[in-house]
Each structure stands twice: as C-alpha cells, then as structure tokens.
Regions:
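Short acidic-hydrophobic, aromatic-tinged amphipathic segments that line or gate anion-handling sites
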Residues: 198-201
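Short alpha-helical functional segments enriched in proximate histidine and acidic residues
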Residues: 151
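N-terminal leader/linker segments that precede catalytic domains of diphosphate-processing enzymes
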Residues: 1-125, 132-146, 154-186, 205, ...
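Lipid deacylating catalytic domains
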Residues: 195
C-alpha cells in the first residue's frame, strides 16, 4: 500500500531496509500547487539572500511503499530545487523532496556538522553530515559518497549502505539514511554549508540539533554499534 507523505502515521514514516530502495521515475512532470509567478518571485528573493543557491534538478516524491524482503519503492517526478526552497518562506508549492543522508563514522564516532546561518533549512543546527538531495541520474549511494568529499573533505572507506527511509515532516522530505565508513576524520575546513564539523558519540549529538537529526539517532546508534569493531581494520 502506498503512503501519502502527508498522512502516514509515525510508525509508517520509518522503513528499515535490508537492501537499497528502488526509485521509480514517472513520466509526468511535477505540477506545483500554486501559481508559478509566486514561486519565481520567492526564488528570486531567496537567491538575493543567498547567491550560492542553485536551481538544479531534484525529485518530488509521489509516494513510498514497502516492497517486501526488506526493501522500499519510492515513486518520484522530476522538478527543480526552487520548488523545495520557496516553501521555507511560506509558498505552498506542494513539493515533497527526496534527500540522502549519512551516518559517517570512524573509530566509533559519528561525523556531525553545524549548518551555516544562511542554509535554506535548519540554519545554525547540528546534523549528521553529510546530507543532500538525491539528484536525478545519480545513484543515491554514489551521491552521498560525493557529498562526503565535497562537504566534509573526506573519502569514503567503502560503498555507502542504505539502512532506512524516513519522512522529515518539518521540511516535508523523504530521506534515505546511509552508513558511510570514513578513511579518516576530517582535517580540512568544511565548505560553506557547515560552520564546523565534529566527531561525536552517537548518544551525545550537540544541541541545537535538527528535527531530522533527532529522527536519525536510533539509526545512528544501530550503525555505530554494529560497526565499531570494523572501523580500525
């Protein structure tokens, strides 16, 4: 049974995975729930605030369902990032995003980052780093490995493993949560998206943490608990 992203109950909004989720792209483009000139005007305002914003291709989530044997299927339509960003200043575009996140670990510690003050979502809040949007035509696991290098300056030790899919109701985004073992902790300054990076115990993530990060705490504890013995080998 498909789950409406706005109506699924709390138990349905987290799906544990034993294999990567399937992303099925529909043939119909995303149609916003409001007039396009409102979106364009709001996007122009956001770009004036933060010139680093980019209106790149993203997926809108139409629905999510379990498909048995520890998997999930995510039905999506193509659109661009502005449909997501404008919601943060009150434009009801109807967009439901698809993100990719990681619990990146080394030697029993997790990588967290304090988001920049000009980030579109969760500014000045801590989150598990890295994170980003699932880009069309890029595998979600490959994408989060790329984000680790671009945002944190660290290479992955092995391929990202998808552990769960969950819904962040604050920003209306479905997130694929991955495990990433790192080659080493970050030793370079983070890019503009983070004010700073730290390695912490999964049970002691700094405050204020984002609502999304709070949802990921149990995922992180499972990942780190299962991986401590392997990080230093």
């Amino acid at each position: 049974m498909s789950e409406n992203p706005h109506q699924a109950n709390a138990a349905q909004r987290l799906i544990w995975l034993r294999r990567p989720p399937r992303i099925l792209v529909g043939t119909d483009a995303f149609v916003p729930a409001c007039e396009t000139h409102l979106i364009d005007d709001a996007w122009s305002e956001l770009c004036q605030r933060n010139p680093k914003l980019s209106d790149g291709p993203v997926f809108h989530v139409v629905g999510v369902h379990r498909d048995g044997h520890g998997g999930a299927t995510i039905h999506v339509a193509r659109t661009t990032y502005r449909m997501n960003a404008v919601r943060l200043i009150g434009i009801q575009s109807g967009f439901v995003g698809l993100g990719t996140r990681a619990v990146a670990h080394w030697n029993g510690k997790c990588l967290v980052g304090l988001r920049a003050a000009n980030c579109a979502s969760y500014p000045n809040q801590w989150e598990f780093a890295p994170a980003g949007s699932v880009e069309p035509d890029e595998d979600a696991a490959v994408g989060i490995e790329r984000e680790l290098l671009e945002e944190c300056g660290v290479q992955a030790k092995s391929r990202a493993i998808a552990h769960a899919v969950f819904f962040d109701s604050v920003v209306a985004t479905w997130e694929i949560a991955h495990e990433l073992a790192m080659m080493q902790p970050p030793d370079a300054p983070p890019n503009w998206e983070y004010q700073k990076l730290e390695m912490v115990d999964a049970a002691y993530v700094p405050e204020p943490m984002s609502a999304c990060t709070r949802q990921m705490l149990e995922i992180a504890r499972r990942i780190v608990g299962n991986s401590v013995a392997h990080d230093t080998h």
